[in-house]
């Protein structure tokens, strides 16, 4: 293992230790992969297939009550009730857009995270968070303004999928498209929480859980290169790179992670990932948020084309979602069109991501941040004897 990879691994481990969530006396079964659940059942003197049955109840049927698991005998159900629980994050606030997008603030301990459901004509995508806040401090990101609090556990990651599935109809309620895709593009940097993100994605892929194709699970990263190299050896899912700048000088300014792992280092790691991945069809997705007169000029498009000339990719151009006190502006339609056309002249596949949820808090992290701020204000008022209740939605 390289010195750089060792450093990254130690950073991840240190972060996990520093922010451990208080443990329940009972085992939360949502923290376990099928292999780990089988090991638990073996310790209980039970056959491995019982673990398979239990996973089906939890993830196929959305069941969190052992008493309702009819093909598991009563003695085993009673054993499970003594030592285990099935616990997912609860929704504290829900916002529904006129275009069908649903955004939830979910409670994890005493903190808030965000999960977003995005229905389309041929699919429904769930955008999942991996951390409470984020340590990377990208200047254009609402979540980054909150700072980093802690990593999410496996159950808090996969539990977002479970909770959303229960709400929008994966478990037999009609009228809403079931979740077909999951993207790790919510709050946080997934590669700084590998210990929990990888098992959560394994559950997403497991046929006894959600059985998603590895092409339908996407991890988006700002470029923690050593962690990407580790992930390459552990799991194969679709990969998206949050690039957002065509040169190191600009990327250093808007994405401080680039000072540690620059564009060349990142793209070298991406090429290694593509060499072994079946999930990506030989192409990586490049994400590029457009900031008015910062990174959206024709010269930037030419520079980006040069950076990506040897990388099989599709490029997603993302209209920036403003948030309070942000230092940037949203690119005009004409600048977006010109940027897209310039890249297409080089032969790239370039898609301008359709803006969703315009009538709700669209910027990632904004809803959770608003809930946290409102709760803090409420607690401060209570502290000084004003006793105002938290606003219900």
UniProtKB/Swiss-Prot annotation:
Keyword rRNA processing attributed: yes
Function statement: Specifically methylates position 2 of adenine 2503 in 23S rRNA and position 2 of adenine 37 in tRNAs. m2A2503 modification seems to play a crucial role in the proofreading step occurring at the peptidyl transferase center and thus would serve to optimize ribosomal fidelity.
Species in which this protein is naturally found: Actinobacillus pleuropneumoniae serotype 5b (strain L20)
Localization annotation: Cytoplasm
Chief place where the protein resides: cytoplasm
Residues involved in S-adenosyl-L-methionine binding: 188-189, 220, 242-244, 321
Name of this chain's protein: Dual-specificity RNA methyltransferase RlmN
Biological process annotations from GO: rRNA base methylation; tRNA methylation
EC number: 2.1.1.192
Family affiliation: Belongs to the radical SAM superfamily. RlmN family.
Presence of keyword Transferase: yes
